[in-house]
């Protein structure tokens, strides 16, 4: 019986096409040269591998924190203004949608859109939810938690996004 053995170089060369990259949370960052030519970057050396850590840091990922007394979502939306963002609470979910129409930048024209949906814990007081956008583009959605047994109130409503003039105090991953 013959067994085909695949050299690790082939896996690295096809890396950008594997499903593990499907869930990257890119919000339309500019393309780098190696994004356009993924095969050339992996053929430099069989031991060369692009740093995934840098990719994660630059990807606009979100962070969700649920402490004893509050629930907080941090989301990097540096390419969007408060007018481009919509934050809604629908029953036990918060939906964050961002969209800006086509506009010109240094490399041509670009439009961006994203949609995020997070489940709210059942003990979050939905009447006291707040959302703000810091000067450095960090969206902070937060709400206090109520003690067990107290009705947290579940209804559909829009949460206004307020602009802060200072940079975010969110931790950098």
UniProtKB/Swiss-Prot annotation:
Signal peptide start-end: none
Region ranges (Required for complex formation with BFSP1 and BFSP2): 1-63
Compartments in which it is found: Cytoplasm; Nucleus
Gene name for this UniProt entry: CRYAA
Binding site residues for Zn(2+) 3: 154
Compositional bias segments (type: Basic and acidic residues): 153-167
Positions carrying N6-acetyllysine: 70, 99
Boundaries of every sHSP domain copy: 52-162
GO biological process, one term: embryonic camera-type eye morphogenesis
Residues modified as N-acetylmethionine: 1
UniProt cross-references to Pfam families, sorted A to Z: Crystallin, HSP20
Presence of keyword Cytoplasm: yes
Naturally occurring in which organism (per UniProt): Canis lupus familiaris (Dog)
Family recorded in the similarity comment: Belongs to the small heat shock protein (HSP20) family.
GO molecular function annotation: identical protein binding; metal ion binding; structural constituent of eye lens; unfolded protein binding
Record's GO cellular component terms: cytoplasm; cytosol; nucleoplasm; nucleus; protein-containing complex
Function field: Contributes to the transparency and refractive index of the lens. Acts as a chaperone, preventing aggregation of various proteins under a wide range of stress conditions. Required for the correct formation of lens intermediate filaments as part of a complex composed of BFSP1, BFSP2 and CRYAA.
PTM-bearing positions, type Deamidated asparagine: 101, 123
Residue positions where Deamidated glutamine is found in the record: 6, 50
Annotated region (Disordered), positions in chain: 144-173
PROSITE patterns named among the record's database cross-references: SHSP (PS01031)
Protein name: Alpha-crystallin A chain
InterPro entries membership: A-crystallin/Hsp20_dom (IPR002068), Alpha-crystallin/HSP_16 (IPR055269), Alpha-crystallin/sHSP_animal (IPR001436), Alpha-crystallin_N (IPR003090), HSP20-like_chaperone (IPR008978)
Keywords: Acetylation, Chaperone, Cytoplasm, Eye lens protein, Glycoprotein, Metal-binding, Methylation, Nucleus, Phosphoprotein, Zinc
Sugar attachment sites: 162
UniProt entry tagged with the keyword Cell membrane: no
UniProt-listed PANTHER family: ALPHA-CRYSTALLIN A CHAIN (PTHR45640:SF14), HEAT SHOCK PROTEIN HSP-12.2-RELATED (PTHR45640)
């Amino acid at each position: 019986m013959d067994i085909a053995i695949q050299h690790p170089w082939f896996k690295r060369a096809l890396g950008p096409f594997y499903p593990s990259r499907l869930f990257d949370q890119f919000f339309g960052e500019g393309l780098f040269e190696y994004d356009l030519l993924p095969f050339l970057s992996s053929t430099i050396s069989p031991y060369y591998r692009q740093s995934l850590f840098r990719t994660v840091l630059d990807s606009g990922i979100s962070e969700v924190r649920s402490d004893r007394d509050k629930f907080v979502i941090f989301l990097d939306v540096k390419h969007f203004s408060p007018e481009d963002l919509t934050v809604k609470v629908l029953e036990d979910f918060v939906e964050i949608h961002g969209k800006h129409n086509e506009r010109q930048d240094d490399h041509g024209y670009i439009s961006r859109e994203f949609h995020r949906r997070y489940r709210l814990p059942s003990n979050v007081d939905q009447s006291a939810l707040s959302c703000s956008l810091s000067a450095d583009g960090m969206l902070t959605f937060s709400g206090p938690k109520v003690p067990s047994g107290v009705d947290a109130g579940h209804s559909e409503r829009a949460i206004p996004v307020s602009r802060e003039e200072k940079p975010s105090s969110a931790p950098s991953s």
